[in-house]
Design a protein with these regions (language model features):
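Generic domain-boundary/flexible-linker signal
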Residues: 82-84, 148, 167, 197-200, ...
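N-terminal Rossmann-like or analogous alpha/beta NTP/dinucleotide-binding catalytic cores
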Residues: 1-164, 270-272
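Extended, charge-enriched helical/coil interaction regions that scaffold DNA-processing
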Residues: 129-132, 145-194, 207-210
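Residue-level "edge-of-site" marker
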Residues: 77-79, 141-143, 169, 199, ...
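Short, surface-exposed, charged/polar-biased interaction segments
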Residues: 85, 92-94, 145, 170-177, ...
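Short, surface-exposed, charge-dense and proline/glycine-enriched linear segments
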Residues: 63-68, 100-116, 162-178, 194-210, ...
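Alpha-helical recognition segments enriched in aromatics with Gly/Pro capping
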Residues: 15, 22-39, 173, 177-312
Length: 312
């Protein structure tokens, strides 16, 4: 009976990292540094599922280093995401007026951080620090303000028709056949999801938009009616999830990112956008299951049925 060699220290993370290295070699990309990423949701209280994503990514980083490669974990806070609903247990803060606004523009209801989004991010960062995870922290609001994704945004918006058709083909979502996959922050009311991009003026790198009522979940969020233009190189706005991962991967040179099965559709589309539109081979992935509560429901920041990393 033939013996098989042990890969690294013999864990599934070693096997995964070995596959990642071989894939990078076959793609002919530089192996000087192999960056891995973990996305941090900032719209509600982070839980052990959020910590688990970062732990997986950090495990891959350590395995890559054990193989002799330099690696870095980027912990990316999606703090430009809009507040879609008020998490359970936070109704006393009267956050209704801030629905659809980026969480980085909402005041911290607890009064200890510069925004609601940074308060939520800090809870998870504290958890990462407590378990000894080393990372480089990046915020979405700074990433967009500094124009780090401006070239990717431009390319994506130039190809919005093609992307909209592909999204419909891959996952059956038709909204981006009509709308651009980009949300400017309305200059009048500071809301994100109410500002619908209607046209991209490529030579000026501006989107035309109108702020109107939208339905989020079962709630109607009122738009202010403003119509205007937003410069993608300097005005605040963000890409839709169906394309934003791809822009980040390309801009930050990400080679690995795990994902939960609840966002499979978004990853499928982003992989295609990364490969075919941005010309950046998508990162190596591993899919994972969700943490469930004792009733069998997925733990959720918005539902409030969470166990934080601190409590764990």
């Amino acid at each position: 009976m033939s013996e098989q060699g042990v890969i690294g220290k013999g864990t599934w993370i070693d096997k995964l990292s070995s596959e990642l290295i071989e894939r990078e070699k076959s793609l002919g990309r530089s192996l000087d540094i192999l960056r891995v990423e973990s996305g941090l949701g900032a719209s509600g209280i982070p839980h052990i599922g959020s910590l688990g994503d970062a732990v997986r990514a950090y495990g891959v980083k350590l395995a890559l280093e054990n193989f002799g490669y330099k690696s870095e974990l980027i912990a990316y806070s999606d703090d430009l995401d809009g507040l879609r609903k008020i998490p359970e247990g936070m109704q006393q803060f009267n956050l209704d007026e801030h629905l659809a606004k980026p969480v980085s523009l909402i005041p911290d209801p607890y009064g200890c951080h510069d925004s609601y989004g940074m308060h939520m991010s800090s809870i998870l960062l504290d958890g990462l620090d407590r378990v000894g995870i080393k990372y480089e922290f990046r915020r979405a609001v700074d990433t967009y303000k500094q124009g780090l994704l401006k070239d990717q945004i431009h390319t994506i918006l130039q190809n919005s028709t093609k992307i909209g058709e592909k999204i419909a083909e891959l996952v059956g979502q038709e909204k981006y056949q009509k709308n651009l996959p980009y949300f400017p922050v309305c200059v009048n009311c500071s809301r994100l999801y109410t500002a619908e991009s209607t046209e991209y003026i490529a030579d000026e790198r501006k989107v035309k938009y109108r702020c109107h009522d939208v339905e989020i979940g079962s709630k109607i969020i009122k738009g202010c009616g403003h119509e205007g233009e937003a410069d993608i190189t300097k005005d605040l706005g963000k890409l839709a999830w169906k394309v934003e991962f791809a822009a980040r991967w390309s801009a930050f040179d990400i080679r690995f990112e795990a994902y939960g099965k609840d966002i499979m559709d978004s990853v499928k589309v982003n992989d295609w956008v990364s490969d075919e539109i941005l010309g950046f081979p998508h990162p190596h992935h591993v899919k994972y299951e969700m943490f469930l509560d004792k009733g069998g429901k997925k733990i959720s920041k918005s539902l409030g049925n969470v166990v934080t990393s601190q409590r764990w």
